């Protein structure tokens, strides 16, 4: 059988989940599901994806690489250590040149503004492989995992506890777009960007979802179908580690928090995890964990993203 996006058309770049409307997001999830089942999609033979990763990566790098190979394309590593990016060449210059050589870029960098500059000058599809502001490909995989478990997305509730970071931003937008309620619980001073929360609330008003920004993790977890967390200290924040360990101590996914959730609740984590900090070993290895399915789904989600953005060019 052949997988297809049907008549759905996409913008050239995926810089934010807000670059996808509700129909496009559902189409991506359906395509990812079809690809996971082994259905074929128009391949990317002869296409080359450049990886510009200014941050360390395991899952994102490997899944993009394998996805591209499985779709018939190739990958080239354009990380700072082996390009002039690491020696201070302006982004606009690098982007203009890469746009003449490769067919798409997956970029992992510290600043969303830098990603946007690549997209502005490259003239080819640019995919957000993680910035300080969002991690959209991760959340496409998360939503795929949730849909596999519950058979639906609308009407569910996700509780995110921890730092209101890039993953939280993409979850807010993604959940709102599919009609899934989301409650985010963070310590004071670590809430998500108010502009992202406001945008998610606006979208939720159309889709019937609810968006809550809370302090109490147990209030957030009450009745939730999905518990989700991320590391308390992200890359680039290592100097804050001890301070954050104290502030986030009550924001751990453990047996007590899981008991507040719905009886059928599952647990997700974007990885890597610091076991014993944001999540206990017991929960990670327990029957409610879907973390390894979630990690696998990065591959299928990113195959769908690559096919959608690069397949018709």
Swiss-Prot record:
User: Pfam families under this entry?
Assistant: OTCace (PF00185), OTCace_N (PF02729)
Look up the EC number in the record and give it.
Answer: 2.1.3.3
**Pathway(s) served:** Amino-acid biosynthesis; L-arginine biosynthesis; L-arginine from L-ornithine and carbamoyl phosphate: step 1/3
**Keyword field:** Amino-acid biosynthesis, Arginine biosynthesis, Cytoplasm, Transferase
The GO terms this record gives for MF are: amino acid binding; ornithine carbamoyltransferase activity
**What Gene Ontology cellular component terms go with this record?**
cytoplasm
- Top-level class of the enzyme under EC nomenclature: transferase
Annotated residues for binding of carbamoyl phosphate: 57-60, 84, 108, 135-138, 270-271, 298
Where it mainly occurs, coarsely classed, is: cytoplasm
Q: Which reaction does it catalyse?
A: carbamoyl phosphate + L-ornithine = L-citrulline + phosphate + H(+)
UniProt-annotated location(s):
Cytoplasm
**What is said about its interaction partners and assembly?**
Homohexamer.
Which NCBIfam families would you find in this protein's record? orni_carb_tr, PRK00779.1
Q: Family, per the entry? A: Belongs to the aspartate/ornithine carbamoyltransferase superfamily. OTCase family.
Question: What function is annotated for this protein?
Answer: Reversibly catalyzes the transfer of the carbamoyl group from carbamoyl phosphate (CP) to the N(epsilon) atom of ornithine (ORN) to produce L-citrulline.
The protein's name in its UniProt record: Ornithine carbamoyltransferase
User: What's the source species for this entry?
Assistant: Gloeobacter violaceus (strain ATCC 29082 / PCC 7421)
For this protein's source organism, the top of the classification is: Bacteria, Bacillati, Cyanobacteriota, Cyanophyceae, Gloeobacterales
């Amino acid at each position: 059988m052949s997988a297809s996006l049907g008549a759905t058309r996409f913008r050239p770049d995926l810089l934010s989940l807000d670059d996808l409307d509700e129909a496009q997001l559902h189409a991506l999830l359906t395509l990812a599901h079809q690809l996971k089942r082994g259905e074929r999609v128009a391949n990317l033979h002869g296409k080359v994806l450049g990886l510009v990763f200014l941050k360390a990566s395991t899952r994102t790098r490997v899944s993009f690489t394998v996805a591209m190979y499985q779709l018939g394309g190739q990958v080239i590593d354009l990380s700072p250590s082996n390009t002039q990016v690491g020696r201070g060449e302006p982004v606009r210059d690098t982007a203009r040149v890469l746009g003449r050589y490769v067919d798409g870029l997956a970029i992992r960098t510290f600043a969303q503004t830098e990603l946007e500059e690549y997209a502005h000058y490259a003239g080819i599809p640019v995919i957000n492989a993680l910035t300080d502001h969002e991690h959209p490909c991760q959340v496409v995989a998360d939503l795929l995992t949730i849909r596999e478990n519950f058979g639906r997305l609308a009407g569910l509730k996700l509780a995110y506890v921890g730092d209101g970071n890039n993953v939280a931003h993409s979850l807010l937008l993604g959940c709102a777009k599919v009609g899934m309620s989301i409650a985010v619980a963070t310590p004071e001073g670590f809430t998500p960007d108010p502009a992202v929360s406001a945008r998610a609330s606006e979208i939720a008003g159309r889709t019937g979802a609810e968006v809550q920004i809370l302090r109490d993790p147990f209030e957030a977890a009450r009745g939730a179908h999905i518990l989700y967390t991320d590391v308390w200290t992200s890359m680039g924040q290592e100097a804050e580690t001890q301070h954050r360990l104290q502030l986030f101590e009550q924001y751990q996914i453990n047996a007590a928090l899981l008991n507040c959730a719905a009886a059928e609740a599952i647990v997700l984590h974007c990885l890597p995890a610091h076991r014993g900090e944001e999540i206990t070993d017991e929960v990670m290895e327990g029957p409610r964990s879907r973390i390894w399915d979630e990690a696998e789904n990065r591959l299928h989600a990113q195959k769908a993203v690559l096919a959608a953005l690069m397949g018709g060019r």
